Structure formats: structure tokens, C-alpha cells
């Protein structure tokens, strides 16, 4: 029987970063037989009830009641991010299937878990689940063709103050981009969404520089050899998800940039 492959897709997302992660897994698949909704993993059934191989990178438990995935999914657990807010907020009593009972058994049956960040590793360690640091799959991204570099700095979902600061400190064109998806974007087909991702990544590849708050703008830039500056969030809720990558990507807080506590040469 021919091996069947599925891909994780989050149709209702408002962040194209989720689509970028899907695009990253797509490059490793010989073909796609099933598009599997990330938040409905517990209801997926393959056509002939065969096992479907799925790369399960991404951020899970937005709808914790839908965990674990069905037995029709043969998972490759890599580049996964989990938050323990479910336990912190006392939800584990309502959703015991996440980190206990058959939820934990899913991890045990499919370990080791490739963790996107150290925070997730520590969570897996606390559950005695075998794991390793895999980083994010978006650091493996590649695009067809060659880069055609342009004298443009893309600023992605940063504050107006940061945009104006950069404009006053460079001779290059500064252009704003966003990772927010509109309802119109959400209604596009899978293939259309992947085309939008490729167009965005091509812009990043061709840029002189990218300045962003978005992890899935910064990490693809590393893969595409584009200089990138990550503006750090002051919100501690982002710490576990982002701080693992501060050793890999140039980063600065907004206040340090605007106050010039740390100097950045945008014309280098």
C-alpha cells in the first residue's frame, strides 16, 4: 500500500506565521494526501482508515479538549511548542486528556518529542517524556530560484515609533508588512495560502534587512540568509516561547532601540 502523507493546517488562524510553519513541513513531504486541521486532530479519519504520516510541528493546545490525535495519524513529533498554562490555570481537571492519562500516553507512544524551545523541553522533562531540542522547522526553509536583493528594509508588526526611528536612521526604503490575516485571507484555499506564504518569504529573502516582533518572520530570515533584528516583547507571557531563540537571532528591546542604549546600524 502506498504511504499516505498529511499536513497540519490551521485554517482559522489570524497569523500567517502558522501558514509559514505549514509551508516548512510541506517541503519535506513527497506528496500531500490529506490536509488536517490542527484544532480537529481528534476527529480525523483517513479515507480507508489507513495510517497517515504527519509532521506535527507547531503550537498546540489552543483547543485542549481536542487532544490527543486519532490513531489514524502516524506522527513525527518535531518542532512542537506547548504551554503549561493549562495546568497553571487549573484546567487540567477539565481537560485531563492533555498531560495525563491517554494524552500523556500519546507522547509516550511516539517519543521522543522534538521541542521547538527550551520551555517545552522543561515541560516534557517534568512529565518524564523523552525529548530533544529540535528548534523550529522554519529555520530549514528554502525557496526556488535565487535571491534578488533590493534596497528595502521590511518592518513587520512593530510599533509606529520603531518604524519612524528606522526611517530616520537609514537611506534605504522602509516598508511595513504584517502577519495578520484578514477574513478574506482565511477563506482562501490551501494552495492559495501557500502561494501567499511563498510570496512573503520571497520578499524576506530579497530584503536588505527585516525588523520584526514576529518569531516566524525572524527565523525564516535566518534560513534565507537575510539580516534580521527581532524586537523583544516586554510581556513576560512571551518569554518561554521566544527567549530560546535570542542566542540565534540579533535582538533588542524597543526601549533600548529608541533610547539608543543599544546602537543598530541600519545602513550596514
What are these language model-derived features?
Residues 1-268:
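Active-site anion-handling motifs in enzyme catalytic cores
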Amino acid at each position: 500500500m502506498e504511504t499516505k502523507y498529511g499536513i497540519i493546517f490551521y485554517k482559522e488562524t489570524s497569523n500567517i506565521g502558522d501558514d509559514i510553519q505549514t509551508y516548512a513541513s510541506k517541503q519535506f513531504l513527497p506528496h500531500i494526501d490529506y490536509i488536517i486541521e490542527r484544532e480537529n486532530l481528534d476527529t480525523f479519519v483517513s479515507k480507508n482508515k489507513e495510517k497517515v504520516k504527519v509532521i506535527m510541528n507547531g503550537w498546540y493546545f489552543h483547543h485542549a479538549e481536542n487532544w490527543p490525535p486519532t490513531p489514524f495519524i502516524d506522527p513525527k513529533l518535531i518542532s512542537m511548542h506547548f504551554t503549561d498554562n493549562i495546568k497553571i490555570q487549573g484546567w487540567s481537571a477539565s481537560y485531563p486528556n492533555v498531560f495525563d492519562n491517554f494524552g500523556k500516553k500519546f507522547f509516550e507512544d511516539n517519543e521522543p518529542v522534538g521541542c521547538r524551545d527550551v520551555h517545552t523541553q522543561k515541560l516534557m522533562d517534568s512529565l518524564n517524556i523523552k525529548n530533544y531540542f529540535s528548534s523550529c522547522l522554519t529555520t530549514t526553509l528554502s525557496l526556488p530560484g535565487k535571491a534578488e536583493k533590493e534596497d528595502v528594509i521590511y518592518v513587520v508588526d512593530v510599533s509606529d515609533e520603531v518604524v519612524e526611528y528606522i526611517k530616520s536612521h537609514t537611506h534605504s526604503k522602509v516598508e511595513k508588512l504584517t502577519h495578520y490575516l484578514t477574513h478574506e485571507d482565511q477563506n482562501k484555499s490551501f494552495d492559495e495560502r501557500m502561494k501567499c506564504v511563498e510570496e512573503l518569504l520571497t520578499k524576506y529573502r530579497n530584503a536588505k534587512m527585516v525588523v520584526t516582533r514576529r518569531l516566524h518572520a525572524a527565523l525564516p530570515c535566518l534560513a534565507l540568509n537575510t539580516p534580521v533584528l527581532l524586537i523583544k516583547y516586554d510581556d513576560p507571557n512571551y518569554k518561554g516561547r521566544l527567549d530560546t531563540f535570542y542566542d540565534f537571532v540579533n535582538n533588542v528591546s524597543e526601549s533600548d532601540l529608541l533610547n539608543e542604549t543599544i546602537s543598530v546600524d541600519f545602513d550596514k
